[in-house]
Design a protein with these regions (language model features):
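Conserved, single-site charged/polar hotspot
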Residues: 2-449
């Protein structure tokens, strides 16, 4: 609470600076977004024109492509083929197909695997290395309508609209920074750039984009766009950019973030359990007997030193350690390893009787699936953990004579810049988006076109 009170004057002064900053022009423009998140390496694709008027360009040939038109592209014997409006398939001898928008509309992309999404703007299809490369060409403000709802949530408009506005400004700034650096294209992947899902996720967040149209975050002195970084949940402490990527950034510095405490459900507090043998096998060791953490001032783990039962050691960078257990492609839950803000605790073996949970660590956290393990005698207190593999893999048929390790953590993501859950909490407390931006980014102002 003292931290919150301490920062309130700063928020008021910083927000005043943001409001009084001299506006500069940030025009909407067309951007090219490569669709790699769900449509990368596509072999067969169908594009349906849902609304508007388009034209289909195939090298030197152009034809009208109005609403109701369909294009199917695929390959046969490593040769690209296409079919227009359910006509006969034909071999495509060129390398680029382009569906250009004449009037505003929308098109839907489908794959045989059941993946589909609707997009504004046009679509370019390139045949490369035995697959189709899809690029959505869309107005930058329309692009944001497919970013903000999936980076945050349309549901946050109820009581958290100022957070959506802050996200819109940050996402717009990120886009400007990426494209102004000479890159002509970004991707729709959150692992590479920022998440983008087209029209399929549009909703209440569009109002936040319209309300902040053209606004970006710039350096207070140079008025150049900053790296407006953000992640889901800071765990209660924003990280310094140099501790994650090695580059000093005066706009993204470490500081306490009490607004991210107590919110976020599973990402606010999580616990991951793994057996000593499985932990060691991930890093070329035998069953681990000791874990030592080297931390940054924020509390995030810089590196992990592991020692196994044979005296062998390995030191792993914090991010690499997280990636070894991160639940890629799985729903986020509190029994997962979600970030580098964590503590480690060993539960050692109990003589000849295996490993017991006398403290009730599993039961209190909902690991009911681990509580059915047989006990060697009735006097053993608590369920045995000797059959546990990990929180994600469950148990094995045979027990192991070594311990298990419990990793308890906070937050989700790299923690640099704006915490999305923290921004949402601030909005719920009545802060405006300018104040949210001033809190999470250092030495900035907002430019408005």
């Amino acid at each position: 609470m003292l931290q919150i009170i301490y920062r309130l004057p700063f928020l008021w002064i910083a927000s005043l600076i943001l409001v009084l900053a001299q506006p500069t022009l940030c025009q909407a423009k067309m951007v090219s977004v490569e669709l790699v998140w769900n449509l990368g390496q596509a072999g067969w694709v169908q594009i349906d024109i849902e609304k508007g008027d388009y034209q289909l360009s195939m090298d030197t040939v152009t034809r009208k492509f109005p609403a109701g038109s369909t294009l199917q592209v695929g390959w046969g014997g490593w040769t690209p083929v296409l079919r227009i409006n359910h006509e006969e398939f034909q071999i495509f001898s060129g390398s680029v197909l382009e569906i250009k928008g004449i009037n505003s509309g929308s098109l839907r992309v489908k794959t045989p695997e059941g993946k589909e999404a609707a997009y504004r703007g046009g679509l370019q299809l390139n045949w490369q290395d035995g697959h189709w490369r899809l690029v959505n060409q869309v107005d930058s403000e329309d692009y944001l309508k497919g970013v903000v709802p999936i980076e945050m949530s349309n549901e946050w408009a109820k009581g958290g609209s100022e957070a959506l506005k802050a996200q819109a400004v940050a996402a717009r700034t990120y886009l400007v920074k990426q494209t102004d650096n000479g890159s002509k294209m970004i991707t729709d992947s959150p692992d590479i750039h920022q998440a983008y899902a087209g029209m399929s996720v549009e909703g209440e967040a569009s109002k936040a984009i319209e309300a902040t149209r053209g606004e970006i975050i710039v350096d207070a002195q140079t008025e150049q766009p900053i790296d407006a970084l953000y992640s889901s949940h800071s765990g209660g402490y924003a990280e310094d950019a140099k501790n994650v990527w090695g580059n000093t950034d005066i706009h993204n510095v470490s500081h306490p973030d009490p607004y991210s405490q107590g919110v976020g459900g599973a990402v606010n507090y999580w616990r991951f359990i793994v057996s000593a043998p499985l932990l060691g096998s991930k890093f070329g060791l035998g069953p681990v007997r000791d874990v030592k953490l080297d931390k940054f001032p924020s509390g995030r783990v810089k590196s992990v030193k592991l020692e196994d039962e044979f005296g062998q050691t390995a030191t792993v960078k914090g991010r690499a350690f997280v990636q070894a257990f991160y639940p890629f492609g799985q729903p986020i839950r509190k029994e997962a390893f979600l970030g580098s803000f964590f503590e480690a605790q060993a539960v050692v073996k109990s003589d000849s009787h295996g490993i017991s949970d006398s403290a009730g660590l599993f039961g209190s956290f909902g690991y009911s699936g681990f509580l059915e393990l047989a006990r060697p005698n009735q006097q053993e207190q608590g369920p045995l953990l000797s059959k546990v593999l990990s929180s994600s893999l469950g148990t094995s048929a045979a027990p192991q004579p070594f311990g298990v390790f419990i990793f308890e953590g906070r937050g989700w993501g790299h923690g640099v810049g704006m915490s999305q859950w923290g921004a949402y909490h601030m909005a719920q407390l009545g802060y405006k988006y300018q104040e949210i931006i001033a809190y999470y980014y250092n030495h900035v102002s907002i430019s408005k076109g």
